């Protein structure tokens, strides 16, 4: 505020500048630019409030509009009139009335700016620290009343101090040349008291409120982070508890599996629960025979424990092996045969076929004897189409032809790849909790091309009356067992071989379509042995089945049938082959035995990913709450507004407080003038402070710079 008095002599109001014309031109250019920037910037703030609904609907933005109006007036009257006084050599050339009016406007608008900044700071503090109460109390009417009071109070104070000073004190206006100054500046104590009352007190209050806003924003951020940490800790504890339970369950399951493996005699067992389910699915009732096992201490690797007992152990092994092999072939064929269920008549015919098979085997003719297991059977074994059973009765030959026609179904590569070890069976193994105890018996057939003789001649050469008697004795028991394991059905089997062939063709088409759909979705990796010819490769006189590797580790159990000789003393006994001669089933290494290995690995990966999933929250930016956003917005606004205010206004009030005591002799005139211009620069910088602190004002300014002054609804 100017500290000058108006001279009473009108002659002293003439223009007499001590500065050169170029200096005056440069100064006027700078002042005009600053004045226009102040006017345009604050006018844009008022216009943004009118055209931007997001700004106008917030009641607190009215304080900003009030501050912009006061700064706008300062830009109109402050810069030009003070520049006239400075360039004229610190003399007022416009008269006494103009001097008093300019002093009144200048002091009033400066105090209005101070009080408005105080209102903005208090509004931001209450909205952050006492949100509920303040929002309930705040209303447009109350806000407008506070704004009016912020204008009326400075006008009343400085109207009395400027226009009524002479009436209050009885002193005439002091004249010192052409000086124009406020009359109360002549009393240093009143001058200092006024500056302390309306500036320094207000500045301290604003700093306290600013500190409160900063602390509130900090506390909200701490609370939000603590809440997020508690939430993450809760999620981690829940997931860890779940994973601990799963780990304990898997550990107990693994211990149970190890205990079951320790009880196995030959390395594989059959689970009766899964056996019953598979038999019911194939259309059979649960058999009453006991399970089969491989006895490593016996001369015969495949023995039968249960229903048949004979005096001769060697003949008993042959008979039981043939009966079990016949039952296995019959169940495998009928489970995929689209005809009626087996009947009692069929059982009798099967018993006759069994007798023929037993006789042919007793003669020393090697035959295919797939190992029987009432669990999940591996259907990958392919029956040799050239192997047929010759009998002396026409009915037996017809039955054998039907059985051989069904063997075509299993001789196809694609069909075997689908029927063997489907994923659905893997799921069933997990549901039955017996995946580790499931034995996959690889059935294989052997073809002898060297020294091949008719079976009838071999039977006549090696058959003995005692063996035939043993076969007849076992016939009744075998037929009875088959009848007990097959449900009664009055329908007769009238399916012809041609119909069976048609069904085989249709089944192949269905399986081919299923394979195409499955390959398009899963696309499993196939091993090098996936493409093999239908004809079997002969290595050491035995046929190796086709191996398909789809990339999964499947538990396997291999039983190798090795020909020890073609003499009648060793009629095709089976034994467990060494590791280098074993066949692999859907596995390249041939060492995996547990299906649970797959699920265990997947489960372990899921456990690790699920445990460390919440940690990813720390890697991305934390989402702020609504209260945090409000606090940070208020903090930014107050930082710019109060920061500009304190930096630009404090130098002048420091010098003005000292100025009254030393009469201007202790303060250089240049510093005093510069500090006064800094007060005006605060009005020029406030619009930029709004734009930097508030995104809504920034977007509105960009619209107006592009020439868009349309009101947004």
From Swiss-Prot:
This is Probable muscarinic acetylcholine receptor gar-1. Keywords: Cell membrane, Disulfide bond, G-protein coupled receptor, Glycoprotein, Membrane, Receptor, Transducer, Transmembrane, Transmembrane helix. The chain crosses the membrane at residues 21-41, 67-87, 102-122, 145-165, 190-210, 634-656, 671-693. Expressed in head region of the larva. In adults, expression is seen in the periventricularis magnocellularis (PVM) neuron. InterPro entries: GPCR_Rhodpsn (IPR000276), GPCR_Rhodpsn_7TM (IPR017452), Musac_Ach_rcpt (IPR000995). Belongs to the G-protein coupled receptor 1 family. Muscarinic acetylcholine receptor subfamily. The keyword DNA damage does not apply. It comes from Caenorhabditis elegans. Residues 1-20, 88-101, 166-189, 657-670 are extracellular. The muscarinic acetylcholine receptor mediates various cellular responses, including inhibition of adenylate cyclase, breakdown of phosphoinositides and modulation of potassium channels through the action of G proteins. Primary transducing effect is Pi turnover. Residues 42-66, 123-144, 211-633, 694-713 are cytoplasmic.
